[in-house]
A protein has these predicted regions:
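C-terminal catalytic/substrate-binding lobe primarily of soluble NAD(P)-dependent oxidoreductases
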Residues: 1-212
Length: 212
């Protein structure tokens, strides 16, 4: 499958089997997981990306009426999507999720040797001219306070801790529901975990406190 588990097997199954929220041609839509596949290269390495569920949170609601198209895709090594499509649809394991879980849990190894790749692309009119902006980065595991941490552990914790720091400093609403998009990249960069977000910002953005 060109894949190994670094987190929840059930979480991966949900991402690959549940409908995905999106905005298509200006309208809220539900698109199918594993569809919308595209290929791209980052630092000379090839990747594929395809629809998966759950990544946008409330962003479709926030950007309704402001963007024409919005989607969220998971990045994998080439060939992974086709193998999963065979399992889910060729063998119809999407209809038997417990069996799918047993197959994946027994056949796909768990590993702490991982890498997180983030790529964000936006296009639109600026000054009457169509422009596209792309930001991308990759993060690998690293030691933290005497223990080796995986890339998914570091990036997941960084998002949570960055948001907590912004909340504690009064930079986020102090009551009510707080959306993930209210934590701007520029604000997150100025937190103690800001180095994990630095590559996603323009080079001219002011540096923040990136200490551990």
């Amino acid at each position: 499958l060109r894949y190994h588990f670094t987190w929840s097997v059930d979480g991966v199954i949900n991402e690959y089997c549940n409908p995905c929220e999106a905005i298509v041609n200006g309208e809220a839509a539900s698109v199918q997981p594993l569809e919308g596949m595209e290929n791209f290269s980052l630092d000379g390495q090839q990747f594929e990306a395809f629809n998966t569920s759950g990544g946008l949170g409330t962003l479709c609601e926030t950007l309704a009426g402001r963007v024409r198209n919005l989607n969220y895709k998971t990045i994998r090594h080439p060939g992974h999507r086709d193998a999963m499509h065979l399992l889910l649809h060729g063998l119809r394991l999407i209809e038997r999720r417990e069996l799918l879980r047993q197959v994946l849990d027994g056949a796909v190894p768990h590993s702490r040797d991982d890498m997180v790749v983030i790529a964000a692309m936006a296009s639109g009119l600026r000054g009457g001219r169509l422009e596209q902006i792309t930001r991308s980065t990759r993060i690998v595991g690293a030691p933290l306070r005497g223990r080796q941490r995986t890339a998914i552990e570091l990036t997941t914790a960084a998002g949570v801790l960055g948001a907590v720091e912004l909340f504690a400093s009064g930079q986020l609403p102090q009551q009510g529901f707080v959306r993930q998009e209210q934590c701007t990249l520029s604000a997150l960069r100025n937190t103690r975990v800001g180095r994990y977000f630095e590559a996603l910002l323009p080079a001219s953005a002011p540096p923040g406190n990136t200490g551990a």
